Amino acid sequence: FTDVASDAWYYNVVSQAYVKGLISGISDIEFSPESSVTGAQLIMMLYRADDNTVSEQTSGNWYDEAVDWAKEKSIISDNNGWTFDANADLTREQMMVLLYNYLQYKGNELSALDDLSSYTDRSEISAYAENAVKALVGKGIIEGDGETLRPLSSLTRAETAVILINAVDSVNPSANQGGMQ
């Protein structure tokens, strides 16, 4: 991608995520690393991570098949604590809930970290996201930004690539039933 410099902090993981088919560019030559990630985009990444092939859409939205799959697998749930909007930018905590639900669907054991006291913004974490945040931090999938997790901030495409690769690298291989290898 012409907009991913070889010395960028995310260069290697963007390359890995692209090669693994988890993430694509916004065009053949652009990745747009600083752009926000929508609900539909993250669900499509998880759909691909589960070894699903994206069908040619003849009607509806490009993401309908992936969103239907995510609802069927309880990755998107009415119990998530917020109303999923495929076209809205995700916050980091919303992404963590969706990724947590995906990893649970894949059969991975995720034990929660006892506390998040090392993060100065822990009080910003919504109640609905607390277990997911604790579990993903405890598993090392989410590392935060120094002393902050920025749960209410939007998520960039570069950050998403890092998180997806961390998830791929940290899952229990014996629990895999597909793409997260």
Roles of regions detected by a PLM:
Residues 1-11, 24-93, 99-130, 143-154, ...:
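Feature responds to low-complexity, polar/acidic, surface-exposed segments characteristic
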Residues 11-20:
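Short, compositionally biased
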Residues 19-21, 138-140:
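Tandem repeat domain/solenoid detector
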Residues 133:
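Catalytic cores of secreted/periplasmic or lumenal enzymes
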